[in-house]
Regions:
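N-terminal leader segment of winged-helix/HTH proteins
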Residues: 1-32, 98
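Short helix-capping/turn signature of helix-turn-helix
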Residues: 45-48, 137
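Charged, amphipathic alpha-helical coiled-coil/dimerization segments
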Residues: 22, 50, 54, 72-135
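Short alpha-helical "packing" element that flanks the helix-turn-helix/winged-helix DNA-binding module
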Residues: 38-42
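DNA-binding alpha-helical recognition surfaces that contact promoter or target DNA
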Residues: 43, 69, 132
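Helix-turn-helix DNA-binding motif, specifically the short coil turn and the N-cap/start of the second
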Residues: 63-66
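C-terminal regulatory/oligomerization modules of transcriptional regulators
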Residues: 1-6, 124-143
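Residues within the alpha-helical elements of helix-turn-helix
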Residues: 44, 59, 77
């Protein structure tokens, strides 16, 4: 019988790392007046490349109800405005307000600094290798 692996299980390492990285990102976003979920919504709304809220929710990996909650909150804060498409009332469009654009710019800086921080301990070759390895794990798990 084989003994225990020399390293902790990969899933545990990935989970711990994801939690640490996510918590650091959330703290940085909160200090700038936002959140990771608000940032994701602002990015997608600003890009304007999503067709329906269902497609947007899928792109974020959340449910439609959760997305609606986020959009409602951003709209209530005056960061996003929504309207029904004239040719198809079932389709809702969204855009950032001026305040939403200002928050987007602030959070983009935070996101870029966070990414630089993550990359700071790795060489360019290691960053590329990490990306390939993470993709390999994702494909191997089936998602």
């Amino acid at each position: 019988m084989n003994g225990p692996p020399a390293q902790p299980p990969i899933g545990l390492q990935l989970s711990r790392t994801a939690r640490v990285v996510t918590n650091a990102f959330e703290r940085a976003m909160a200090q700038a007046g936002g959140s990771a979920s608000a940032w994701q919504v602002l990015v997608l709304v600003r890009a304007g490349q999503w067709g329906t809220q269902a497609e947007m929710a899928e792109a974020m990996g959340i449910t439609g109800a959760t997305l609606t909650h986020h959009l409602n909150a951003l709209e209530d804060q005056g960061l996003v405005r929504r309207w029904r498409e004239a040719s198809n009332r079932r389709v809702q469009q969204a855009a950032l307000t001026e305040a939403g654009e200002e928050l987007f710019d602030r959070l983009r800086e935070v996101a870029m600094r966070h990414d630089q921080r993550l990359r700071s301990t790795l060489s360019e070759k290691e960053v590329e290798q990490l990306g390939r390895l993470l993709e390999k794990v994702r494909v191997g798990v089936g998602s």
